[in-house]
A protein has these predicted regions:
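Active-site donor-binding acidic/aromatic loop of nucleotide-activated sugar
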Residues: 186-196
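Nucleotide-sugar-dependent
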Residues: 194-229, 236-244
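Short beta-strand->alpha-helix junction loop in the catalytic core
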Residues: 45-47, 139, 154-167, 183-184
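Extended catalytic core of nucleotide-activated donor transferases of GT-like folds
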Residues: 48-129, 135-142
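Acidic anion/phosphate-binding donor-loop and adjacent secondary structure
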Residues: 113-115, 156-178
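N-terminal pre-catalytic "stem/leader" segment of glycosyltransferase-like enzymes
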Residues: 1-81, 94-99, 313-314
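A charged, aromatic-enriched C-terminal amphipathic alpha-helix characteristic of glycosyltransferases
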Residues: 258-263, 270-315
Length: 315
């Protein structure tokens, strides 16, 4: 029995600049580290292809998958032609006793319309074809279950892994705010624009950009993971999906209104900041090492193959 994960292979530019391709590749790398094999595919140009041609291509991709295998599909698959995903799942289901999980990067109908009450879109129907959904966080899982009418088992991953390079810097001015949101106007913020994270992780807090839509408030923040990867505690709005995780593990400051940050920092001592730095340390290492995808992969085996379900699997 083999465990598989899909990986999209785009251009050099895409893998260097497109966040979806970057995260897809890093996830496949993490899965390989825990024993998964990779099914590689490309962003195919299929708009003018006949259904038979699409089926042939998909059949070739799945030629190594055998009965009783497990497959994690990174979803969506980033194909211009919707037939590819549909046929891909249909072909998998023809293989006896194969278990299929979706590593869900985006809920496309909600991303496009910001209508989180829409559970009837054809893309939502595709999600119901899986045996398990690996979703970003519990808030999104609840929304998918309640509004998306998805009754599948779901496992909340927790954080987006971000495999950055470089050594963590010693932290100096703990009242500095590292800010990458162009909407910010607070005087105490230090605006770094596109400065690489490794060059600006020398102290203070990383300000997680506010959610620009209802959908964003239900998804995992890549900026949060970037700050944690460099060892920075964060400032995050209370309405965001990962605010409770930050509060629970003392990874930063949770605020209803960013304007309250002056008062919070005025009352903070260097000892308070050091406690947050210490708390961030283990999470920084986890994000940098691909821990969250690795855990999701191993949990998928436990849930779907071993049929063990306990509190670790948020079903």
């Amino acid at each position: 029995m083999t465990n598989w994960i899909t990986k999209i292979n785009g251009s050099v530019v895409q893998h260097a600049t497109d966040v979806h391709f970057i995260l897809n590749g890093q996830a496949a790398e993490s899965a390989e580290a825990v024993g998964f094999s990779v099914i590689n595919y490309a962003p195919y140009q299929l708009r003018d292809a006949a259904d038979e041609d699409v089926e042939t291509r998909v059949t070739t991709l799945l030629s190594g998958v055998q009965p009783d295998d497990l497959l994690i599909v990174q979803w969506p698959m980033w194909q211009a032609d919707a037939r590819f995903e549909k046929i891909f799942i249909e072909k998998i289901r023809l293989i006896p006793r194969v278990k299929v999980a979706a590593l869900l990067w985006e809920v496309m109908p909600w991303l496009m319309t910001d209508d989180l009450s829409d559970g009837t879109h054809p893309e939502m129907t595709k999600l119901r074809d899986f045996d398990l959904l690996l979703v970003g966080n519990p808030k999104l899982a609840v929304q998918l279950r309640d509004s998306g009418n998805i009754a599948l088992p779901m496992l909340a991953i927790g954080l987006i892994d971000f495999k950055c390079q470089g050594l963590l810097k010693a932290k100096t001015d703990f009242k500095d705010l590292v800010f990458r949101d162009s909407n910010g106007t607070e005087e105490e913020m230090s605006y770094h624009g596109q400065t690489p994270f490794i060059a600006m992780a020398d102290g203070g807090f990383g300000v997680v950009p506010a959610a620009r839509s209802q959908y964003e408030a239900h998804t995992n923040s890549l900026e949060l993971s970037k700050y944690l990867s460099m060892g920075l505690p964060v400032v995050i709005r209370a309405n965001m999906a990962q605010a409770e995780l930050v509060r629970l593990h003392n990874l930063g400051i949770v605020l209803d209104d960013l304007n309250a940050i002056d008062a919070v920092l005025a009352d903070m001592t260097i000892m308070d900041y050091q406690e947050k730095l210490t708390a961030v340390g283990a999470w920084s290492e986890a994000v940098r090492s691909g821990y969250f995808v690795k855990r999701a992969c191993l949990e998928s085996i436990r849930i779907l193959k071993l049929r063990e379900v306990d509190y670790l699997a948020e079903i």
